[in-house]
Amino acid sequence: MKGIKEAKSGTTLAGKNKNSYLNRLRKLNFVNTKIDAVVCQLSTNDARFGYEIGEMSQSFNLESFDTETTLGAIEYIIKYVQTKWCCPVIFYTCIRENDVTYKQLVNHLYRLKTKWDIHIIDVYNNDELNKLAKSDKEMMADDSHPTKKGYRYLYTPILVKQLDEIL
């Protein structure tokens, strides 16, 4: 399996910004390439930049999602990927200290998991990883961004293990 990194620092799931997850996703054009899965971070930036969480839609129609809200953008991404590439969609959550909005977003993601049959790699609720991040201050650059050491010892092992299980 080969990975393609399309992440950009400081971007959001929701919104019409040219660097939003949605706009970057729409620009991807993989010709004659089998996509094994799309892995997407549950952004910590949406709340910081003032996007509302929104509501889970009852619809499965791509055009009905409110992409100016985080949940609407997530549902759009899921439907877009499932339609365009017919592959699993995997969201991973982040270590985030004292952020009630992010906790709510993680809880909503589990409701979306049921609706859309997506996968979640839950770093946010992983007690072992959170304890390790708190005990070694070199793991995190701030309350939500891992350092290289944090990626190496916190995120990479759980992502590799769970991606192997999912795929």
Stretch-by-stretch model annotation:
Residues 67-70, 74, 151:
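Aromatic/hydrophobic pocket-lining residues that form the small-molecule binding cavity
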Residues 1-4, 33-38, 84-89, 115-119:
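Loop/turn elements at helix/coil->beta-strand transitions in domains of secreted/extracellular proteins
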Residues 1-64:
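Conserved SGNH/GDSL esterase-like catalytic core that processes O-acyl groups on lipids
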Residues 41-45, 75-108:
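Active-site segments of SGNH/GDSL-like serine hydrolases
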Residues 22, 71-78, 106, 156, ...:
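Extracytoplasmic/secreted envelope proteins and their assembly/folding machinery
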Residues 1, 28-36, 82-83, 156, ...:
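N-terminal secretory targeting modules
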Residues 94-167:
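Catalytic His-Asp segment of secreted/periplasmic serine-dependent ester chemistry enzymes
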Residues 60-70, 143-146:
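A short acidic, glycine-rich active-site loop
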